[in-house]
């Protein structure tokens, strides 16, 4: 599964869903005391198992050793990982059409409802509003949207930024992003005029 982290990051780069130093991925395995996460400031198209950062978990807290440089979005990953008892991957990418759709004012949750096949397999949360990258506000709002109303969503859009998805492994999280990116591409190619239901109050409410 650690090898798959590099595999999905390289595939995301090939699809132009990230530039060389964008995106991040983490894995926490059931019954273990380590969080595996991509490092900060490295080219994500050349991520391999030996470059993955390993962080010890002690009494529910991350123990960062001196010199370790995990992704700047570590807090967002940990919010989504720490309360989950099983094996989970968190994947954050910047897919072009998904970001473009949000920039155009679409709520990805509402758009997904227009495509039954996506809505069947992938639960899409309401968009997160525009917030600074690597901020606690982004981490908290992303987590809040992913569990809003007691529902565990699979993916959430982050306005003018990217998307964050979860899965039992990196490829499952990747597939959620792929489905949403596909419908965003279709909608934009068709110049689809979806009723704009997104507003700042809704995006901040969780």
Question: What do the PLM-derived regions correspond to, one by one?
Answer:
Residues 1-206:
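Glycine-rich flexible loops
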């Amino acid at each position: 599964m650690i090898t798959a982290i590099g595999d999905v990051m390289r595939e995301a780069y090939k699809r132009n869903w990230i530039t060389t130093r964008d995106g991040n991925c983490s894995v926490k395995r059931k019954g273990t005391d380590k969080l595996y996460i991509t490092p900060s400031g490295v080219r994500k198209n050349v991520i391999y198992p030996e470059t993955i950062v390993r962080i010890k978990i002690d009494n529910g807290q991350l123990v960062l050793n001196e010199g370790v440089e995990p992704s700047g979005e570590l807090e967002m990953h940990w919010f989504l990982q720490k309360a989950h008892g099983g094996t989970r991957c968190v994947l954050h990418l910047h897919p072009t059409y998904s970001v473009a759709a949000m920039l155009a004012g679409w709520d990805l949750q509402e758009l997904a409802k227009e495509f039954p096949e996506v809505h069947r397999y992938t639960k899409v949360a309401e968009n997160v509003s525009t917030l600074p990258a690597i901020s606690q506000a982004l981490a908290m709002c992303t987590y809040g949207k992913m569990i809003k109303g007691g529902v565990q969503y699979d993916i959430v859009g982050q306005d003018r930024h990217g998307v964050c998805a979860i899965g039992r492994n990196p490829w499952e999280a990747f597939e959620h992003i792929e489905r949403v990116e596909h419908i965003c591409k279709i909608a934009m190619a068709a110049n689809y005029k979806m009723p704009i239901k997104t507003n700042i109050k809704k995006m901040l409410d969780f």
